């Protein structure tokens, strides 16, 4: 199944954040899932991992590039995101990227941030029950 993974899920996995890492691992390591991220998430992950260290930053980028299909963050996606009515433009870009990639779901811990999304958002727990 094609799913776009929100950055919070990737960080749960990479940082082994309890109690969320277990569900993240089940989703990210399931070969039945085709994983997508928006291109801007790669640089954001690098930035956020600075608190852990330089090696972790590189490992995060390598993990994403190896395990995910990157949805280009082009003018079409950025323009589409502006029309979605999201309070947070970055979340709108994620939703527009999921739509462009024809993903079935966005997997996130912040489901309410995607209330206006053209692609349904599920929490990891919800996704694991389908």
PLM features: residue spans?
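Short, well-structured N-terminal submotif of metal-dependent ribonuclease cores
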Residues: 1-36, 51-59, 130
């Amino acid at each position: 199944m094609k799913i776009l993974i929100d950055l919070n899920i990737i960080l749960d996995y990479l940082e082994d954040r309890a109690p969320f890492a277990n569900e993240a691992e089940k989703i990210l390591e399931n070969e039945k899932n085709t994983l997508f991220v928006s291109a801007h998430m790669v640089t954001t992950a690098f930035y956020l991992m600075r608190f852990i260290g330089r090696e972790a930053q590189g490992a995060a980028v390598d993990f994403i590039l190896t395990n995910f299909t990157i949805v280009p963050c082009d003018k079409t996606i950025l323009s589409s995101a502006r029309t979605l009515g999201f309070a947070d433009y970055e979340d709108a870009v994620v939703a527009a990227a999921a739509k462009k990639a024809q993903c079935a779901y966005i997997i996130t811990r912040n489901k309410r941030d995607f209330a206006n999304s053209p692609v349904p958002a599920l929490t990891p727990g919800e996704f694991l029950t389908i």
